[in-house]
């Protein structure tokens, strides 16, 4: 059986993957999958840094399944701009977008989408709001207009949850439901009254429709943190200082048996 791992934001750094490779004694193959919970960092600057990062990931003999974050462009937009350089595939029994030069990197759909992973019904939810949006715009740093799900995408996703896929085992998102936002990690120089929390509010709303789930994992906040179970479900915030061995978690229903700390970038 292939192995599946989860990790948080990479932001264009291959070092956490290199450390994982060393920790894992180079035992993974391209049948094994590393799921990145947003802010992957491969489609940000559109120069040699992006391509160098994606090329280096290929050295570690894994397939990467990417949930889009807020600090990167939508793969669907890149595909529309460069139709000869991208294509669609099916992976985990669902639609993905692939850049031709990097076939080992699979991008989950830009809207809410269902997949089957290790026999589990999985919902992917990309995107988030950038709290440093106005600073990025002022400094001419990368900021992506379509970073969040649109209202139409959220409405469509909720409809599918209620009508097409009544049982969801695992939710993989970039940001979290409202109740799990780690306010102790918020940047002090950001006026929180100016922050758009519509996605977090939406995720909090749909969480009530998704219970009982087994696992909800997200990135975004740059810390790994295990939350108490709620209605049998395990909320988990992840950064790139740890991976979750999804096979072990599912076998034990114990997040601590699957969570492996190894590095901090």
Regions found by a protein language model. Name each.
Residues 205-209, 221-265:
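Binuclear metal-dependent phosphoesterase catalytic core
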